[in-house]
């Protein structure tokens, strides 16, 4: 049980570090830039904080034993455990949540952050999503 608690604490700390990096980027740059600018700065913040990540990670579709590359890309995957989809749009829609949930299912990543930088306070543009644990 103690080992499980340690894993949960480590994961929570990592999530807080990631959200802190997002807040720092938004605080420094504010709204109004392209998504690509926020992504580059966010990745730099992750490096500064010592987190491993993959940028523009391909997401394949498994169909009848074949992995098909349809051009889907996840903006950032942090330490294989947190998927981050960045936006710089007027407002988040249900479609954007559906997009990240689909990426999470295809990537087998249980936690996602949907982030819209085009807001005055990042808390308004930050949405945490999670999938239930897989059962065998």
Tell where the protein language model's regions lie, with residue ranges.
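Nuclease catalytic cores
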Residues: 11-20, 31-35, 39, 43
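Conserved catalytic cores of phosphodiester-cleaving nucleases, focusing on short active-site segments
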Residues: 30, 53, 74-92, 103
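A cross-kingdom feature that marks ATP-driven nucleic-acid transaction machinery
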Residues: 43, 51-54, 94-99
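A short acidic/basic microdomain associated with nuclease active sites
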Residues: 47-64
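Acidic pyrophosphate-coordinating catalytic loop
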Residues: 63-67, 122-123
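Nucleic-acid nuclease catalytic cores
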Residues: 87-136
């Amino acid at each position: 049980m103690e080992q499980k608690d340690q894993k949960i604490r480590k994961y929570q700390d990592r999530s807080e570090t990631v959200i802190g990096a997002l807040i720092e980027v938004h605080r420094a740059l504010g709204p109004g830039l392209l998504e690509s600018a926020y992504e580059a700065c966010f990745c730099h913040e992750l490096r500064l904080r010592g987190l491993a990540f993959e940028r523009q990670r391909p997401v394949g579709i498994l169909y009848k034993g074949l992995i098909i590359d349809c051009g889907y890309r996840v903006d950032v995957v942090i330490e294989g455990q947190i998927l981050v989809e960045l936006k710089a749009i007027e407002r988040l829609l249900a479609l954007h949540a559906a997009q990240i949930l689909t990426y999470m299912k295809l990537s087998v990543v249980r936690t996602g952050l949907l982030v819209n930088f085009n807001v005055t306070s990042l808390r308004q543009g930050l949405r945490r999503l999670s999938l239930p644990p897989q059962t065998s």
